[in-house]
Design a protein with these regions (language model features):
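Membrane translocator/pore-forming domains, dominated by Gram-negative outer-membrane beta-barrels
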Residues: 1-250
Length: 250
């Protein structure tokens, strides 16, 4: 049994365009976030069975903008995840890995207001179970000796992109969201104008992710990932996503 622990940090930015019922532009919502987390990885050496445990906290700074009106809030988010998988070799360079993951996440937003009125947020949380598999290449990612024709890079870089160690993968999954909770109350200064909304994320989604990683130096790996989530029942999430990663070891 091998065990690996570590900490990580991340920064993110998202921007969403909001449209009115008639399709016209209503405004934008932006979110800048910084995260700090820790992880524990366990691997059974003889079978390859692995488990990942992750705990993460995130600080959000959100801004909703429309014509002549802004709304800003800050909040804290948290996430806990337990994921496991068992890889099977189909060929020497192709692997199939069934996976199962449980995730619990929550969000606590500050109250806010704009020119139209106030918004009071409660504490929200949701649980997710993902079942799927990962199919991809299983090539040796050892960088080896440099082959660059440029003298300064001769020992640390490859002559061409085709010489880089590369792995690809695709990951289809089914995601079930349940026990989602969270209230939001909006109103104005007028007495009795307040209304409470209790949106739900409960439902089932189909998720497809694909990625590629390449070792460009002995200690540097670059990766890209893209995916699409489609809701098939309830009020579960739907949309596109993308991610680029840079991994440097010391």
């Amino acid at each position: 049994m091998s065990l690996t622990t570590g900490v990580y940090g991340a920064a993110g930015h998202s921007s969403v365009d909001v449209k009115d019922d008639d399709g016209s532009r209503a405004g934008t919502v932006r979110d800048d976030a910084g995260s700090l987390g820790g992880y524990l990885n366990l691997i059974h050496n003889s079978s390859g069975l692995w488990a990942d445990i992750v705990a993460q906290g995130t600080r959000h700074s959100m801004k909703a903008s429309s014509d002549n009106n802004d709304f800003r809030v800050r909040d804290w988010g948290w996430l806990g995840s337990l994921e496991t998988g068992l890889p099977f070799s189909i060929t020497d360079n192709l692997m199939l890995e069934p996976q199962l993951q449980y995730t619990w996440q929550g969000l606590s937003l500050d109250d806010g207001q704009d020119n139209a009125g106030y918004v009071r947020f409660g504490h929200g949380s949701a649980q997710h179970v993902r079942a799927g598999f990962r199919l991809g290449s299983h090539n040796d990612m050892t960088f080896g000796e440099g082959t660059s024709s440029r003298a300064p890079l001769r020992d640390s870089a490859k002559h061409s992109v085709r010489e880089l160690p590369v792995n690809w993968w695709v990951q289809p999954s089914v995601i079930r969201t349940f026990s989602s909770r969270g209230d939001m109350r909006v109103g104005t200064s007028t007495a009795g104008s307040g209304m409470t909304f209790s949106p739900s994320q409960n439902g089932t989604s189909l998720d497809l992710q694909a990625g590629l990683e390449a070792r460009v130096r002995e200690n540097i790996t670059l990766g890209v990932q893209a995916g699409y989530v489609h809701s098939v029942s309830g009020s579960s999430a739907e949309g596109y996503n993308g991610q680029a990663t840079l991994n440097v070891t010391f």
